[in-house]
Amino acid sequence: MEQGRPRSSLSLTSSASTVSSLSSLSAKKPTRVVHKVHAFGKRNNALRRDPNLPVHIRGWLHKQDSSGLRLWKRRWFVLSGHCLFYYKDSREESVLGSVLLPSYSVRPDGPGAPRGRRFTFTAEHPGMRTYVLAADTLEDLRGWLRALGKASRAEGEDCGLPRSPARPRPGEGPGGPGGPPEVNRREEGRTSESPEVAPLSRGPGRHEMHAPGSSADLQPDTWSRRTRSPEPFSPLSRPPSPLSLPRPRSAPVRRPPLSAGDISFPARPHTPLSRIDVRPPLDWGPQRQTLSRPPIPRRGPFSEAGGGRPPRSPQLRTPEHRTQSTQVSSGSSTYLQLPPRPPGTQASMILLPGPPVDSTLHQSLETDTLLTKLCGQDRLLRQLQEDLDKRQEEKEQLEAALELTRQQLGQATREAAASGKAWGRQRLLQDRLVNVRAALCHLTQERERVWDTYSGLEQDLGTLRETLEYLLHLGSPQDRASAQQQLWMVEDTLAGLGGPQKQPPHTEPKSPSPAPQREESSERESLSESLELSSPQSPEVDWGQPPGGDRALSSSQSGVGSPRVSRASSPECRQQSSPLLRTKAPLARPRMSAQEQLERMRRNQACGLSLPRPTSPRLLTLGRTLSPVPRQPDMEQRPIVGAAKWLRSSGSWSSPRHSTTYSPVSGGHRERVLSLSQALATEASQWHRLMTASPERNLDTRGDCLQPSPQPPSEELPQVTSSPTSHKANSATTGFSCQGSGRGLAPWEPRWDPGKAPPALAQEEGAWPLRVTLLQSSF
């Protein structure tokens, strides 16, 4: 049992050659004790650097020589993983030496240290060589101390639980391709140990003779398995949880569950208590044992925790081993780990949540940051606008000076000297004009960029104000108070800014002009015009409103109106309406109702006919009363030619009481329109026959006389007058006389002689094509 066990093993916490170990073949040779500090890790004994490990810091440092006059030598140092390598120069070709930093104490030198250089620090280990290094600046010193301190405490993401690795490949060290060199050379039998280890490593202790003896009967192959595998390098302290450790690159993904013999951790009583033996992992550093972190809390027996590891045999863990695994050396400054806490205290300490995040403070800081950025962008916009104004004024002055110079050149062609001066002045002005225009272009692009940032900040501020208003109404009392303060701060800042900035004119989204609408099809124009004039709103209310936003607002509130008089047509609302709404506005037009189609048919029929002037003064008065007031200029109304500008509705003007939105009907809508148009044509032909017939047929006992419709005055045609032929018909011998008040049906008597026929209408006058009886019923 004792022959299969090596006398000494490789201790990674100090270095690969601090305590050299013999292979199983050289175990019979006596170990020679060297009573001096061994200079380790230089040249051939240096560790091989793994190129896959990350480099934490690299740079130039001055290293004090360990022999002779203690001269300072400038070397290139690289901290990779937990090992410090140094080279001759920054090409990093050949390693001059290596220092494995775990269990080293790295501290800066005091001001009174007789080093001869500034910014020095020391890395020392008991029984090992002490390294004295010096940085060039104070910042370099702080950076190196921070990095080397973490590496000496074995902190970082590349340290973890050493797992049972696969067998090392031939030609590789026990730690894999990047591990320490294999130390089974026979010519290295004269390797030495440190003074502390040598007196204790001459033979096994008493506890070592008896402690594993009880388990030797139960597990006879334990020591042979330990000899073949690198298990003697496993740590003596409690290992952390395997779930928190990264998987090595060369290790298999899945491993079989370990037996009790594989998990046993042998004790080494000949090792000082201040050192822990760790086996070299596969990647020589990524999974190194974390020495400064507290161990995983115990949750009771393994059967309760449900872990994947089987319970250890009680014979494998003696009280001596427990004391060795929990004791901490007072001489080493690296191992400042406290003894394990009780399970309840440790679990409660780990499960304690962090301090709650103050959402109110975070939101206040966000508001303050947003307002600060907004003020900065506002200042930039104002400065850019001032610069643009100055450059624009300078450009105008240069253009005026160039015009004057051009005139002088035209006048002074005879004088050579004056002409030369004028040409030089013109050249200078042209150069300055080019520079000013280039500056204008640059300032314009800069203003566009700042404006984009300003617009984004305005949107963020609007969202933040909505959130604050929501908290002000529905939040907790504390949130309400904070939201109110932030809202006041926002209002004060915006008031100090003097309102929002105006968008640059050349980047303003242009609203659709009415010119393309005029060039559309005649059907679309007729629809818009009929919607304008046959709107459900009464003309008195519509024409009595002031121009601008109030009219547009009332039109949008009514729900129905023409797209030309919508809210988006006013200049104020054109800037506020989004491009999406402006593109969809022309598409959302309602279908024409039956009444609107009749209006359109009548208007088209009356366009080419000049209507005669009614002879009754009563009808003239009513026509003037019903004539529409000229519309406001902001309505973008298309000019109407001829008699088509005056449209008579069927019966009366629409009233707000009957303002119902038209919903398109299905089924016989088209047939209904055709039947109505046919009835109108029949009535028109009957009216034509009545006007051209004899007086006997014209005088009917029904008294159901038809009243001609008035022709109101308009802008282009102040009063539609009849032709000379109709003027003769309106004389004293011919015409109409009305009796009654105009309410209801009243007999209309002719004023011509009974023996004579009524005057026939001229061809250019035409007949009355409209249903004028409905106009009488509306009075």
Swiss-Prot record:
Q: Enumerate composition-biased segments (Low complexity).
A: 246-259, 324-334, 528-540, 608-627, 649-659
The record, for CDD domains, names: PH_PEPP1_2_3 (cd13248)
Query: One MF term from GO for this chain?
Result: phosphatidylinositol-3-phosphate binding
GO cellular component terms, alphabetically, are: cytoplasm; extrinsic component of cytoplasmic side of plasma membrane
Region (Disordered) location: 152-355, 495-669, 694-766
User: What organism, scientifically named, is this protein from?
Assistant: Rattus norvegicus (Rat)
Q: Which gene is transcribed and translated to give this protein?
A: Plekha4
Record-given protein name: Pleckstrin homology domain-containing family A member 4
Specify whether Membrane is a keyword of the entry: yes
